[in-house]
Design a protein with these regions (language model features):
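Terminal, low-structured helical/coil segments at or just beyond the last alpha-helical repeat
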Residues: 205, 211-246
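Short helix-capping/linker turns of helical repeat alpha-solenoids
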Residues: 61, 93-94, 125-126, 158-159, ...
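Register position in tetratricopeptide repeats
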Residues: 41-42, 75, 104-108, 140-141, ...
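Canonical tetratricopeptide repeat
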Residues: 67-68, 100, 133, 166, ...
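N-terminal leader/linker segments that initiate helical-solenoid repeat arrays
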Residues: 16-64
Length: 246
């Protein structure tokens, strides 16, 4: 799974909500915002949390900072607090918080809620990356019918072959060898390294040790161009098993 990047800063909010009254002067507000920016630049997480909490206390309807606070709690894996503040940010019109809470629910393995919010966000912002997360959530729920539908959408624009590989895995698990092979090969054509490992196992499972060995060796060559040591290990182990079985 590709690592998800939560938007921390420089977010253009399409709706910031109505600001409540604050006793803080304009100058004090500007000063606090600069302090927050400096804390981000220095990656001073403790100070950043303190400052944003202070800001939110003064401006409880500022959707941008509500979302920022939620992101901080997400990065701390304090999911209950993150959920609370994302929901407040959403109530006040921050659309990015919808995507962020969808990711939060994915991390919590609450896949139904994750899908719900990703689909809601998709209606507002046409971001193809959402397709991948929706597909992944369905996959984790073992709902292959919907997972395949969304991975097929991703495959149309994705360049690395990840989705094609996932499609191959699902079709193979369903016993559809023809479709599995088709999608593994499509994944390899885009250069996805793990598809080589899956093709190795695919042909080994068919008893075609020569073809399995061919894919294992090709995969090992590919791993020389990557830093994926685990894949290299698995391919070498697979090759060893294949050779011993001959």
């Amino acid at each position: 799974m590709k690592k998800y990047l939560i938007l921390l800063l420089v977010i253009t909010n399409l709706g910031l909500g109505v600001q409540s009254f604050s006793a803080m002067t304009k100058e004090e507000k500007t000063k606090l915002e600069k302090q927050i920016d400096n804390a981000y630049e220095k990656n001073d997480k403790k100070k950043l949390e303190t400052l944003i909490i202070k800001y939110v206390a003064e401006f409880p309807n500022n959707a941008d900072y509500l979302n920022r606070l939620a992101v901080l709690y997400t990065n701390q894996k304090n999911y209950s607090e993150a959920e609370k503040w994302y929901l407040k940010a959403i109530e006040n019109g921050n659309f990015t918080a919808i995507s962020n809470i969808a990711y939060l629910y994915f991390e919590k393995k609450d896949y139904e809620k994750s899908i719900k919010y990703y689909k809601e966000y998709q209606k507002l912002v046409d971001n193809p990356d959402n397709y991948l997360w929706i597909a992944a959530a369905y996959y984790e729920m073992d709902d292959y019918k919907n997972a395949k539908e969304w991975y097929l959408k991703v495959a149309k624009f994705e360049k690395d072959g990840f989705s094609e590989n996932k499609l191959g895995v699902m079709f193979e698990e369903e016993g559809n060898q023809k479709e599995a092979l088709k999608w593994y090969q499509a994944s390899v054509e885009k250069g996805y390294p793990w598809a080589y490992y899956n093709l190795t196992n695919f042909y080994a499972g068919l008893g075609d040790s020569d073809t399995a060995e061919k894919w294992a060796r090709k995969g090992i060559e590919i791993t020389k161009k990557t830093d994926d040591e685990s894949l290299k290990k698995y391919l070498k182990e697979a090759l060893d098993v294949i050779q011993k079985a001959k």
